[in-house]
Amino acid sequence: MFSSLLDLRVHRVYHISTWFGQVRESYRKPPTSTLVNGFGNHVGPRTSERELTYGVFGEDGKLTKLCIGRYVEFAPRLDLKSLSSCSPSAYLAFMIDIDIIRDGRTVHLLHWYQPDLVLAHKTHELVQTCSDRKGALYGAPAPPGGSSHRYVELVFQQPLNFTFPESFEHYLEPTIPARLFFNITEFAAAAELGNPVAANYFTVLGTRTSTEEQQIIEL
């Protein structure tokens, strides 16, 4: 049920991003080849150069352009040209794996949560401000060999008096058991967030020796 709710929500977000224009993200090159992801799992040297294919949606809602980026090892740099550079707002960013299977059902895993992001004037990049608010450290995609997982990225406008819901505190721990069963719909309701302002997703296919990413497809 949660997967269906999220799929519907993300489908709506793609239409929102179409109205606003291009929504794009890229990834910084990792400084070293030492690969331990945010969950403390050794990934292996060949996964350091996973390729991300992301798309640009035209006014008709169709995927019009494919570009190649690299390195999903670390948290993404979010470039949102669709948002006004004069906006005084702060933003929240999430990355969620929506294809985790547990006990025969699909559940979600929180890979990243970052509050207090603001839009840089010249670059349109969402950058972190000095803040006492905790985030959920980034955990790189590493699906089991032979399985294909979708990773959804969502950006919300942060309310002026934003308070992190106490019932979700355990999701901030950097372990897989703590991050399982995250529900973005319930979080948005508890935190009194509005609709997302931007979203994207990519698909990762896990293999025994490396992780290769597939071309983005429309929902």
UniProtKB/Swiss-Prot annotation:
- Tell me the protein's name: Phomoidride biosynthesis cluster protein N
Pfam families on file: PBP
Q: Which SUPFAM superfamilies match?
A: PEBP-like
What gene name does this entry carry? phiN
- Sequence similarity: Belongs to the tstN family.
Gene3D superfamilies cross-referenced by the UniProt entry: PEBP-like
**Origin superkingdom:** Eukaryota
The way this protein is applied in practice is:
Phomoidrides A and B (also known as CP-225,917 and CP-263,114) are potent inhibitors of Ras farnesyltransferase and squalene synthase. CP-225,917 and CP-263,114 inhibit Ras farnesyl transferase from rat brain with IC(50) values of 6 uM and 20 uoM, respectively. CP-225,917 inhibits squalene synthase with an IC(50) value of 43 uM and CP-263,114 with an IC(50) of 160 uM.
> Main role?
Phosphatidylethanolamine-binding protein; part of the gene cluster that mediates the biosynthesis of the antihypercholesterolemic agents phomoidrides which are dimeric anhydrides. Within the pathway, phiN is not essential for dimerization and its function has still to be determined. The pathway begins with the highly reducing polyketide synthase phiA that catalyzes the formation of a C12-fatty acyl-ACP, starting from one acetate and 5 malonate units. The hydrolase phiM is involved in the release of the C12-fatty acyl chain from phiA.
